UniProtKB/Swiss-Prot annotation:
This is Oxytocin receptor. Pfam families: 7tm_1. The keyword Glycoprotein applies. Residues 360-389 have a biased composition (Low complexity).
């Protein structure tokens, strides 16, 4: 069934290198043919994505744990976004990698439903935690006095995770272990109505991509307007302070200059965090746009080239978003990784120094014991010589 194949593609459920015998044929009519060359490319791409996502996000979490500013609100959101990216790596990329290696799903029906459920949980969590971080930056810039407190931040993150768990529930009912050929079982999606794949893929696209992108665009539109307005006010205040009337004002002019400079410093710090979240959002859009474009094309166009290699590889590149985020953190918060490297070097130096001290003390003990033995033997010889004479 065309709808079943499209649904499997949409969430990386079925081995993407499987080419169906016919677009209009039933999926249970015969086992799909396997494109071995394409499967090897998929395995290589997924291995690279998995390595980058695991290593990068693990370093971010370790750096956030060792930093002195671990209670920062921005770092709090970064931590949960890194956790979501690790969920994508472990429960979305890794199962798909194993699937491409084995070609078939080997496991019970419960494991099939659980894997498909967790794959979409990571997708929702990564998207909506990024949206929450952007809303926090919008409040910090537009309404700094009414920005969320830390306890509210925790509740918002908890509500986001719970919402993602609930929104992913349809996966449990759509996917199951089914017989796709005589004696051949696979984790497959089945829709009761023929319009089911179109409705489901469209809903996923709206919930994970289109609606978040609209909200993100609104957030950064407000942020850009507020920053532009703030720059205008600071420019006007600086011009007024440098005017002759401001110079004649004495202490008042100096106080105005002090206020302007302090506001400028605070704005630079906030603008830097806004730049970081904006680049993360841009990476999100770049990575997910081809994926959802191909998804919508596959279910709304019966003549879509579902067997084309480029069409299938694009399905895998959405997970690149989980690899990009750690490098963006490193670019804008380099002190985190600098502190992590320094901590690692200090621990390594302390370990090596401890080993050297241990070796030195051992050698001193051996030298002192040999000196005592030689001293005792010489004294014994001096005492024994008169008796023999």
């Amino acid at each position: 069934m065309e709808g079943e194949l499209a649904a499997n593609w949409s969430t990386e459920a079925v081995n993407s290198s499987a080419a169906p015998p016919g677009a209009e044929g039933n999926c249970t009519a015969g086992p799909p043919r396997r494109n071995e060359a394409l499967a090897r490319v998929e395995v290589a791409v997924l291995c690279l994505i998995l390595f980058l996502a695991l290593s990068g996000n693990a370093c971010v979490l370790l750096a956030l744990r060792t930093t002195r500013h671990k209670h920062s609100r921005l770092f709090f959101f970064m931590k949960h976004l890194s956790i979501a990216d690790l969920v994508v790596a472990v429960f979305q990329v890794l199962p798909q990698l194993l699937w491409d290696i084995t070609f078939r799903f080997y496991g019970p029906d419960l494991l099939c439903r659980l894997v498909k459920y967790l794959q979409v949980v990571g997708m929702f969590a990564s998207t909506y935690l990024l949206l929450l971080m952007s809303l926090d930056r919008c409040l910090a810039i537009c309404q700094p006095l009414r920005s969320l407190r830390r306890r509210t931040d925790r509740l918002a993150v908890l509500a986001t995770w719970l919402g993602c768990l609930v929104a992913s529930a349809p996966q449990v009912h759509i996917f199951s272990l089914r017989e796709v050929a005589d004696g051949v079982f696979d984790c497959w999606a089945v829709f009761i109505q023929p319009w089911g794949p179109k409705a489901y893929i469209t809903w996923i696209t709206l919930a994970v991509y289109i609606v978040p992108v609209i909200v993100l665009a609104a957030c950064y539109g407000l942020i850009s307007f507020k920053i532009w307005q703030n720059l205008r006010l600071k420019t006007a205040a600086a011009a007024a302070a440098e005017a002759p009337e401001g110079a004649a004002a004495g202490d008042g002019g100096r106080m105005a200059l002090a206020r302007v400079s302090s506001v400028k410093l605070i704005s630079k710090a906030k603008i830097r965090t806004v730049k970081m979240t904006f680049i993360i959002v841009l990476a999100f859009i770049v990575c997910w746009t081809p994926f959802f474009f191909v998804q919508m094309w596959s279910v709304w166009d019966a003549n879509a080239p579902k067997e084309a290699s480029a069409f299938i590889i694009v399905m895998l590149l959405a997970s690149l978003n989980s690899c990009c985020n750690p490098w963006i953190y490193m670019l804008f918060t380099g002190h985190l990784f600098h502190e992590l490297v320094q901590r690692f070097l200090c621990c390594s130096a302390s370990y090596l120094k401890g080993n050297r001290l241990g070796e030195t003390s051992t050698s001193k003990k051996s030298n002192s014991s040999s000196f005592v033995l030689s001293h005792r033997s010489s004294s014994q010889r001096s005492c024994s010589q008169p008796s023999t004479a």
